[in-house]
């Protein structure tokens, strides 16, 4: 045998794992049956957070390279998709926790002060490494989020906050996307023409519709013209950067263009993996938002208007965080600039050939 035998129990470290639950209600001589469930669900969250961080660190190391090989992109995409699957799984764990009734929870809740899920170092690491900036977070008890962590964790978190996040690294990767402009082709010139033609055709159709009253025509045309105006930022870098400075965009002008190109031409072989990566990042943001929302609903169900054990406003804080804590919002907002696939300008043959595989 090449390696010495290993026992299942020892390999999984089950002795320390299964003896890591220490209910406070038992310690205080007032055993509450559901406290063990409460502990195990939260310990399971932390185990899954550890796996998410393991996958996330791998993806970060890939995208922080000056160039990313196609094979590495496939691996990164698969690991991001694994993170999505884990996040969906932990959302399902809320169902298990909700088998505990509010009265069951009150049997031991007062014994937990001031412990709070807000103190989860691993969850804060996940958010920060993905790219949730301190300015995009809700203040917690009028203090920065990291102040709820232990002193050693605060130092580590401040160090992580000063390093490039996945959002930062993906932005730089997008900026390196080729194909946006060729020797005799500028994608954005052709896309602008297609957008203008689509809206002008719609405006002409409305104006020539004999069944619409003049007032309705004017209102519809004004709406179409306003929507067309929203595309200005896409074609005017100065206008885009002004909106970006106001916080309406986070990605750079070049990165936004690349992300839109990938979405519009995702069926091209060379863009299929980049599209999977963008979709996985969207899914991560969405599932994290869903998990926060389920957490907020559970807090309302368990606590009503009571404050949280960590001193927060409970349900209200969680609901507000659900609405505010977004990371890849620009990818969601890209759909603003979509036009029907039938009207997307075709790529020149030379560029389409470069995007394709040949045998």
Curated annotation (Swiss-Prot):
GO biological process, alphabetically ordered: L-tryptophan catabolic process to acetyl-CoA; L-tryptophan catabolic process to kynurenine
Name of the top EC class for this enzyme: oxidoreductase
Cited InterPro entries: Trp/Indoleamine_2_3_dOase-like, Trp_2_3_dOase
Ligand binding (heme): 295
Keywords for this protein: Dioxygenase, Heme, Iron, Metal-binding, Oxidoreductase, Tryptophan catabolism
Binding-site list for substrate: 38-42, 109, 309
Reactions it catalyzes: L-tryptophan + O2 = N-formyl-L-kynurenine
Protein family (similarity comment): Belongs to the tryptophan 2,3-dioxygenase family.
HAMAP family: T23O
Function, in words: Heme-dependent dioxygenase that catalyzes the oxidative cleavage of the L-tryptophan (L-Trp) pyrrole ring and converts L-tryptophan to N-formyl-L-kynurenine. Catalyzes the oxidative cleavage of the indole moiety.
Protein name: Tryptophan 2,3-dioxygenase
Organism name: Bdellovibrio bacteriovorus (strain ATCC 15356 / DSM 50701 / NCIMB 9529 / HD100)
